[in-house]
């Protein structure tokens, strides 16, 4: 079973409603598998659909057609299970330089539905060797 599987995934964004606007075909019948342990790079010019593809994988957007599975779990119908296997790092992390390292992690984890996770943040800080920096401001 592949770690990630895209099967006939298409995404059409509706017309904006402005005069002359038309629907935008961002993805058309994309199919591929990524096996566990395999390295995979997603390259392409602006507007090629990379962000749309990742947004669908992360459950932030829904495909117009097709399905995406993560370790066999459908991202649309088994999102909670699929999400356990995913980690998405946004292109640009937004943080307040006056936050402590701990506060920044709490804030960012909230974007991904991870609330009340002090034990996990402690484990993360320890694992990264940053436990002594937890109370330091991000700008330091």
Task: Give a label for each model feature.
Residues 40-42, 54:
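Short hydrophobic beta-strand immediately N-terminal to the Walker A/P-loop
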Residues 45-49:
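Walker A (P-loop) phosphate-binding loop of ABC-type ATPase nucleotide-binding domains
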Residues 58:
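Helix-to-loop junction immediately C-terminal to a conserved catalytic motif
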Residues 66-77, 81-82:
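Conserved ABC transporter NBD signature motif
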Residues 106, 110-134:
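Conserved ABC ATPase "signature" region
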